Amino acid sequence: MNQLWRASCLQVLITFLLIHQNKASEKDRFVELVDCIADSFTVVLNKSDPEVMRMISNPKSQPVVYVYGHKTRHPCGTSMKDEKGLTNFNLTIPYGSECDVTLTDLPKHRYAETTVVLEDNADLSFGKTTRLNHVFCLYTRNVKTIRFSDVSNGHEVIASTGGKPKPKVEMLFRSTDSGKTLQAARENEFVEFFIALSPDSAYHGISPKECTFSDREDISAPDAKKITFVQGGCPVNGMNDIIDPLANVNDQIYFSKFRTFRFGNQSTVFVHCQVQVCLKKDECSKTCYKKVSDSNLTAERLRFRHKRSITDLERRTTRSAPTDDNGSLDLTNSLTVVSRIESAELVASPISQPTIVDTPSEQRRDPCPKSSNMGFIPLIIMGSLASLLLFSAGAAIYFGCKLKSMKKKDSFDMMSAFSNPTVSMPVTYSHYQRSAYNASVDSLYR
């Protein structure tokens, strides 16, 4: 009973110490994140850290952050405040002997680490606070990808407080005629094959290490059939009847062309590739791959064409499964190879009509009738409008001419009236023009 009690007390004590240690480590950490690029990494300080906030707000403080042991070297340290009051929370540490930060090669990764120091230069007391924070970067060396159409990253799950950039590697198949991305192809037809890296600030080159055709999603199955066309980082000789040797564009894109085939009667073919990812292009450069220097092919153009070509295609569901204890995932997709007989049957078979299920009358909607003469209706309307326009113009011309002739007939010519002696001009007087003088004058003519 006493032993059980002692064990319980010891377990509670260990749990308390672990919790206290984790809280202390979180409290002591003043680095928010680490941004890893190819030739250096940038340490970003936590702006909400109480000590950092206190030194920034104190006008007399002079906070600095630097690589441990290299305070006097300019590239290895920086001041967080300048004379103008501007603040800086970033420290970029280059790789090399200058700051004694080097990349260490591991079987699956590259590793760089150091320790940064945060202190106040204005504090000259003996017991001033100096804080240390361990930082590191972890770079993936190999990427296992089996997928045709999407970006596949290294999925290794490693507990860390540093940075771990993920390379973007894409594998896809395209038609040799239209250049569209393929999910199915006919047997014995040529298909283009691409492996492309989208270069970023960390990764600038790739190199295929091993690529295999297989009839199984799980390539490690005992009865899986395999055809390896890249092995040991170079194309396998004697595979020209199936696939051409991979060619290299700028150490970032590898492409080839192969003739589709089937494993027996199985129409699904899987492609497995393991790719080495490099921080510099020359690290992945190999002479066994044919280099194409005059090509304008880039990963961005490949991705643009791929996205444009798959908009009308049904996206296949991604299947993933863990492959090792580190938790890395292999993404799987398949290429359907249709035989000549199956292709002929698909062409000859009638198009199946969808079955119409009877629905209640209030929910059933009859489709709008489509007449075969729907295309002639606009022509008929246009002809009628043109005829009406011509008729209106003719009527307007006819009535205009007739009105003009009537005006000429009823008009009065003053010169012809005075020159013709037989014409009598009656003179009328208004009521207001009749006067005594006018009456006497009028009587003379009667």
UniProtKB/Swiss-Prot annotation:
Residues 35-295 form the ZP domain. Its main location: membrane. Disulfide bonds join 211-273. Proteolytically cleaved and secreted in vitro. GO terms for biological process: amphid sensory organ dendrite retrograde extension; anatomical structure morphogenesis; neuron projection extension. In the embryo, expressed in the excretory cell and, during dendrite formation, in the non-neuronal cells surrounding the sensory neurons, including hypodermal cells. Gene3D superfamilies: Zona pellucida, ZP-C domain. GO terms for cellular component: dendrite membrane; extracellular region. The chain crosses the membrane at residues 377-397. The keyword Cell membrane applies. It is found in: Cell membrane; Cell projection, Dendrite; Secreted. Changing residue 394 to D: In ns118; results in defective neurite extension. InterPro entries: Celegans_DevNeuronal_Protein, ZP-C, ZP-C_dom, ZP_dom. Residues 1-24 form the signal peptide. The keyword Disulfide bond applies. It is a single-pass membrane protein. Keywords: Cell membrane, Cell projection, Disulfide bond, Membrane, Neurogenesis, Secreted, Signal, Transmembrane, Transmembrane helix. Required for permeability of amphid and phasmid neurons to external dyes, chemotaxis to ammonium chloride, avoidance of high osmotic stimuli, male mating and dauer formation. Along with dex-1, enables neurite growth and maintenance by anchoring amphid dendritic tips during neuron cell body migration in embryonic and larval development. Monomer under reducing conditions. Homodimer under non-reducing conditions. May also form higher order oligomers. This is Protein dyf-7. It comes from Caenorhabditis elegans.
